[in-house]
């Protein structure tokens, strides 16, 4: 029921009474269903699953969730972005940990392993204190076979409860088939799900009392988060998308743009900027032209990619060509990028899809963290591109 959000891979981990079994695959959910015979090859009553929209690491089987520690005794799924994951990863590697994927999520699994003392709750809070960013986590510990732990910080997470079982999800539609009674986790809250009940805690490991909310939505409305249309929903998601795009780039009040991959001297040497895009992304460029020329006093030319690629543009030395695309796969825009690279000028991609062609081929890339956009008319993708 969360497929409408868009995803590039999926995976599942199930405890079968002896060990945690796992299967994951790139592509549509149907691929995973076929691999597991619609779940028949992964028997069990305790498990976690995930559909992934790539943020760290391109879509692949290895980068798909769940992720695990070295002996598969701790398994994690994760929505969100761990901003300091590279720092944490370096520390873990210095301790002898090896990584199979490019994701920030695998760092979480190894962090849990590093601090694990037999007490899941204490270990989780210790790791929470060391992670920066947004996350919703689902966690299995092999030595606590009848428990699932879930954690929320700046990323949605709900808990559904019924006589037949308890569930976690990032959005209400996923649980409505089983229950309409849900708990909404607040920031830095943890929940332990067991066969018999739910236990809620704060980051100080103090147990909390929470009341469920009864959901009145029908399934169709729920998939749109209570909005009549996806576009309306995405309009209201713009503040979060803008925040998610800005936050990782602001440190102690300063804007960090290390993603440009340029020194201060190289930035000052830029003599002209071309912004190349199609559709709504082109209009982002038109707006950006006014801002760049007013604040940076650098001449900016905005081109439709379909025109740029065919008109043999004059690209002086010290030109920066900025390529803007939500998908990172727009054919004319990709061709324009390749033309700019052939002419030997520096290129910067601004895209929303990690691992896309433009992201791979541009000299440097800046990601917009808008998440998948379902409506045809753009809203949050435009806003984050402009930011």
List each model region and its residues:
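Predominantly extracellular/luminal regions of secreted and cell-surface proteins
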Residues: 232, 236-237
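Acidic-histidine catalytic/liganding microenvironments
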Residues: 238-239, 295
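Glycine-rich phosphate-binding loops that contact phosphosugars or nucleotide phosphates
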Residues: 268-387
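Functionally constrained cores in energy, signaling, and assembly domains
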Residues: 39, 61, 67, 83, ...
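Conserved short alpha-helical segments that host acidic/polar catalytic motifs at enzyme active sites
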Residues: 1-224, 228, 240-271
């Amino acid at each position: 029921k969360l497929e409408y959000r868009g995803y590039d891979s999926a995976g599942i981990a199930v405890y079968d009474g002896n060990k945690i079994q796992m299967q994951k695959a790139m592509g549509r959910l149907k691929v995973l269903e076929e691999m597991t015979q619609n779940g028949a090859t992964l028997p069990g009553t305790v498990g976690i699953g995930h559909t992934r929209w790539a943020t760290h690491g391109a879509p692949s089987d290895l980068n798909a969730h769940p992720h695990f520690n070295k002996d598969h005794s701790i398994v994690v799924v994760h929505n969100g972005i761990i901003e300091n994951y590279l720092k944490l990863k370096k520390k873990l590697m210095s301790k002898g940990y090896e990584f199979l994927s490019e994701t920030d999520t695998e760092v979480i699994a190894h962090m849990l392993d590093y601090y694990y003392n037999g007490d899941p709750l204490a270990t989780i809070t210790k790791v929470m204190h060391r992670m920066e960013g947004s996350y919703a986590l689902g966690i299995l510990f092999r030595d606590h076979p009848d428990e699932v732990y879930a954690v929320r910080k700046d990323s949605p997470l709900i808990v559904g409860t019924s006589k037949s079982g308890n569930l976690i999800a990032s959005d209400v539609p996923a649980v409505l088939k089983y229950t309409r009674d849900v708990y909404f986790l607040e920031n830095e809250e943890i929940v332990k799900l067991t066969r018999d009940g739910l236990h809620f805690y704060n980051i100080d490991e103090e147990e909390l009392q929470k009341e469920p909310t009864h959901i009145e939505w029908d399934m169709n409305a729920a998939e749109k988060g209570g909005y009549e249309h996806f576009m309306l929903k995405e309009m209201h998601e713009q503040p979060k998308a803008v925040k998610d795009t800005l936050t990782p780039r602001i440190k102690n009040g300063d804007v960090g743009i290390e993603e440009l991959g340029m020194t201060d001297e190289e930035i000052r040497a830029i003599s002209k900027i071309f912004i190349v895009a199609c559709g709504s992304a082109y209009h982002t460029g038109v707006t950006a032209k006014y801002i760049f020329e007013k604040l940076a006093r650098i001449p900016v030319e905005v081109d439709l990619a379909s025109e740029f690629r065919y008109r043999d543009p004059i690209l002086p030395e010290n030109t920066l060509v900025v390529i803007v695309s939500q998908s990172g796969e727009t054919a004319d825009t990709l061709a324009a990028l390749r033309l700019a690279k052939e002419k030997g000028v520096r290129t910067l991609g601004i895209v929303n899809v990690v691992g896309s062609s433009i992201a791979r081929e541009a000299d440097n890339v800046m990601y917009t963290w808008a998440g998948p956009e379902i409506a045809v008319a753009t809203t949050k993708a435009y806003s984050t591109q402009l930011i």
